[in-house]
Design a protein with these regions (language model features):
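Catalytic DNA-binding helix-loop module of base-excision-repair DNA glycosylases/AP lyases
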Residues: 97-142
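Amphipathic alpha-helical segments within well-ordered protein domains
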Residues: 22-23, 27, 60-64, 102, ...
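C-terminal end-helix/capping segment
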Residues: 134-149, 154-161
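N-terminal polyanion-binding entry modules of DNA glycosylases/AP lyases
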Residues: 1-96, 158-185
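Hydrophobic/aromatic-lined pockets within catalytic cores
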Residues: 124, 145-146, 178
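Long, compositionally biased
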Residues: 86-89, 103-104, 140, 144, ...
Length: 185
């Protein structure tokens, strides 16, 4: 039913893990509008090209002036440093299972399970991501399946089983049902 309602758009990969991780860190625990505003300022500081070298060269004060918290600045600076020193190796993720990749990504500062799942879904186009910490997904499930918010765990497991191995696609369509703008990271 949802697929028929949202024929335009699709899951699109940016194929740039540094960009996506920065966007994920910036967007944590703030509204989409606030995240977009901060991200635009961040992008401007990077002169339109977001990469580890440019971000590493920026001062913490410069990053804070974009509206980033001290912890987010530390997370982004640490990520840039690890990419440049090659102590974080994104290419390894391609060979990992979803759970192994989530654990590996979660070793990064400011990256938890939810952020790791967003990276797997949007950057690596993994097909079976079911991000149950995502409030939007839980709200969409409640709306579309006439369940109370938070849907019962037993129901979430049933849906997971139904949508496997395409939970990522189901997630995307469920998100679309509550937000006309296709989500991208």
């Amino acid at each position: 039913k949802l697929i028929e309602n949202y024929k335009d758009g699709s899951l699109v990969t940016r194929n740039d893990i540094f960009f996506s991780l920065c966007k994920s860190i910036i967007g944590q625990q703030i509204s989409v509008v606030a995240a977009n505003s901060v991200f635009l300022k961040f992008k401007k500081k990077c002169k339109g090209r977001i990469n580890a070298k440019k971000v590493h060269a920026l001062s913490s004060a410069s990053l804070k002036s974009c509206g980033l918290s001290r912890l987010k600045v530390k997370g982004i600076k640490d990520l840039a440093r690890k990419i440049l020193k090659k102590s974080f190796k994104p290419d390894l993720i391609k060979k990992m299972s979803d759970e192994e990749a989530i654990e590996y990504l979660s070793e990064l500062r400011q990256i938890g399970r939810w952020s790791a799942e967003m990276i797997l879904l949007f950057t690596f186009n993994r097909s079976n991501i079911w991000p149950l910490q995502d409030i939007g997904l839980l709200r969409a499930i409640s709306n579309n399946y006439k369940k109370k918010y938070f849907p019962p765990k037993s129901f979430l497991k049933k849906l997971n089983k139904k949508f496997t191995p395409y939970c990522s696609v189901a997630t995307w369509y469920l998100w679309r049902s509550i937000d006309d703008e296709p989500i991208q990271y």
